[in-house]
């Protein structure tokens, strides 16, 4: 349930078109009168397991809405996330981000809303990853007891692709994690202080453990003699790989010149072990992300207590002198990213193409 809005303007149309198939799979599509009522209905789906007369072990729920709809539904997200999901249910919250305000009165970036609601979220970079991350997101929601956000942009959700579904039968790894007595899932007669304790002390850490076990964040390119690393996510990652191709840099060239690339699938909370291992031995980390800095702030915080002699320089929206590198007031493009990468590489690698 949810409410339509670009770039998710066609989602409900496709669900209506697939109504016969959905009914056969016992999937109910009930669009909301508005975003918050849709989110409330999805929250209600997690209560099924609490009913002793329930006919199902659990129900998974998907909420959808564009950026301003997330603003409207924040109270529901906060309460639903704090209450928790069902162990056999789970909730995926799909948000359409219009970074360039192409069909909105203001640009929108859902990252900070999800963080404020303490909702872990995933950022797919391709049509294929909508399937992969969607399945991972529901499994993460069941494991960690949280709602899981899911960023959709026009560059991914309003495109088409051929996806080989045979590769989606991957085994999802359930990590070892020490949960509190009684677990972290929804329960009857809960006390709000206890809800908040589970949220603050366990759920986010459980999400990070799940992300680490399932390789949601990963090294894409490595180098035996690393000097500079690029960290990116979602649409910006796809643009970054295109920019590197325009510069004539592939995995072999990157390994030779000391360039590493790290793809973040879960921008918040940023899983610390993987990103720290990636940053070891680097002179510089360039963070490429849409709109305001988000991963960049988390990375700087995680590396802050490293000794200065081993801590890499971290740049993104600004360079080390405070000058703009990747401005937040427009959408990024492969061309803009290519210029920034070329400028950061020229100190130790330059070619006619660059």
Regions found by a protein language model. Name each.
Residues 1-127, 153-155, 224-227, 231, ...:
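Thiamine diphosphate
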Residues 124-354:
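Flexible, low-complexity linker and terminal segments
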């Amino acid at each position: 349930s949810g409410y339509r809005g670009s770039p998710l303007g066609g989602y409900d149309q496709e669900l209506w078109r697939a109504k016969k198939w959905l009914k056969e799979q016992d999937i109910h599509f009930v669009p909301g009168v508005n975003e918050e009522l849709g989110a409330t209905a999805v929250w209600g789906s997690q209560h099924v397991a609490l009913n002793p007369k329930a006919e199902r072990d659990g129900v998974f729920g998907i909420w959808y809405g564009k950026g301003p709809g997330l603003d409207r539904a924040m109270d529901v997200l906060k309460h639903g996330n704090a209450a928790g999901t069902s162990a056999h249910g789970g909730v995926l919250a799909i948000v359409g981000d219009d970074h360039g305000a192409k069909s909105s009165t203001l640009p929108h970036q859902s990252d900070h809303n999800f963080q404020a609601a303490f909702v872990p979220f995933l950022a797919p970079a391709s049509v294929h990853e909508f399937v992969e991350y969607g399945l991972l997101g529901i499994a993460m929601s069941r494991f960690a007891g949280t709602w899981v956000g899911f960023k959709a942009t026009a560059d991914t959700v309003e495109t088409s692709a051929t996806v080989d579904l045979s590769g989606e039968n991957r085994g999802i790894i359930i990590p070892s994690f020490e949960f509190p007595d009684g677990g972290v899932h929804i329960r009857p007669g809960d006390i709000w202080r206890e809800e908040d304790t589970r949220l603050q002390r366990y759920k986010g850490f459980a999400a990070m453990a799940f992300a680490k076990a399932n390789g949601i964040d990963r090294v894409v390119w490595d180098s035996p003699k690393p000097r500079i690393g690029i960290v990116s996510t979602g649409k910006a990652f796809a643009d970054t790989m295109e920019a590197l191709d325009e510069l004539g840099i592939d995995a072999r060239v990157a390994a030779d010149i000391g360039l590493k690339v790290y793809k973040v699938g879960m921008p918040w909370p940023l899983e610390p072990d993987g990103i720290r291992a990636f940053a070891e031995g680097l002179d510089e980390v360039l963070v490429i992300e849409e709109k305001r800095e988000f991963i960049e702030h988390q990375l700087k915080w995680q590396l802050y207590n490293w000794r200065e002699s081993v801590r890499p320089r971290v740049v993104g929206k600004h360079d080390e002198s405070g000058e703009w590198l990747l401005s937040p007031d427009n959408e990024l493009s492969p061309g803009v990213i290519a210029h920034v990468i070329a400028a950061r590489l020229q100190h130790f690698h330059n070619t006619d193409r660059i």
